[in-house]
């Protein structure tokens, strides 16, 4: 999940869903509220820890943050120097996740089809939005960016990292991680906690009351997000980042046969297949673990 959340266009929520921990994650997060905090005061840490599924949350968060801290530099380098190959791998991964989540939809009717199309349209529209030109690293802005992005991170198909890109916060956040600026990281994390506790309760309610339709819309989100991670892009406009380097600002998806330069088509297809197979393998591991 940490590695996925670093990539602008891939959602850690998708990985959580595929690995079979998504609903447990929502239940555990939404259990953190004023009532359980009172339980901590009256009954002690042991009772509180059990109610919020503490072992699960700590193990998951440690894995996410370890992955983000260790892979942020590598993924940034790969996105800059090998973008087609990186996007190809994640395209295959996300494509397989659509099939995986789609299999869990138990009822198809006109409302479900509309929900799928609406979810796909919303996600596609988000992928076509232009990022903000300015990069902002003020504490208040990073707090708000963390709160908004975390909502996307736990939604399968909507990338929290891409939301940071749209807000103009992606580069400041990566810089804070690279430079070990723990003050800015803490501000971002606090915003993320506030957003996470609020949004998880809504998602938990939707799963409890409208699970089938929620799955339909989430599948649509992932389907629509494929536009963002399509490997071959044409750059329409450029911008100069904070380091004085010219980088793509506005891009659109094109055919690999229309791509200027080496499309790396054969290797891209291979990596897409590997990404697709990785999800199938992850699904089998999750199923075997749940059957034990």
Predicted regions and their residues:
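Multi-pass membrane proteins that catalyze or facilitate reactions on polyprenyl-/lipid-phosphate substrates
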Residues: 1-5, 11-155, 159-292
């Amino acid at each position: 999940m940490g590695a996925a959340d670093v990539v602008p266009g891939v959602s850690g929520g998708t990985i959580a869903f595929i690995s079979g921990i998504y609903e447990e994650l929502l239940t555990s997060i939404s259990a953190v509220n004023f009532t359980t905090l009172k339980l901590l005061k009256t009954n002690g840490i042991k009772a509180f820890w059990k109610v919020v599924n503490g072992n699960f949350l700590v193990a998951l968060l440690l894995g996410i943050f370890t992955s983000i801290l260790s892979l942020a530099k590598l993924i940034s380098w790969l996105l800059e120097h090998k973008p087609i190959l990186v996007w190809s791998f994640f395209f295959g991964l996300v494509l397989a996740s659509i099939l995986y989540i789609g299999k869990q939809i138990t009822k198809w009717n006109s409302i479900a089809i509309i929900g799928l199309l609406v979810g796909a349209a919303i996600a596609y529209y988000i992928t076509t939005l232009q990022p903000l030109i300015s990069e902002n690293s003020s504490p208040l802005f990073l707090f708000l960016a963390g709160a908004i992005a975390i909502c996307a991170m736990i939604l399968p198909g909507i990338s929290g990292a891409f939301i940071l890109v749209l807000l103009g916060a992606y580069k400041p956040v990566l810089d804070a991680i690279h430079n070990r600026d723990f003050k800015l990281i803490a501000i971002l994390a606090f915003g993320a906690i506030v957003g996470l506790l609020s949004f998880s309760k809504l998602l938990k309610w939707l799963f409890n009351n409208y699970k089938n339709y929620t799955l339909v819309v989430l599948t649509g989100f992932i389907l629509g997000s494929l536009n963002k991670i399509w490997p071959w892009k044409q750059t329409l406009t450029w911008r100069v980042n904070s380091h004085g380097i010219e980088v793509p600002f506005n891009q659109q998806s094109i055919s690999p046969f229309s791509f200027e330069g080496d499309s790396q088509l054969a290797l891209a297809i291979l990596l897409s297949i590997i990404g697709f197979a990785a999800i199938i393998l992850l699904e089998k591991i999750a199923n075997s673990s749940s059957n034990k």
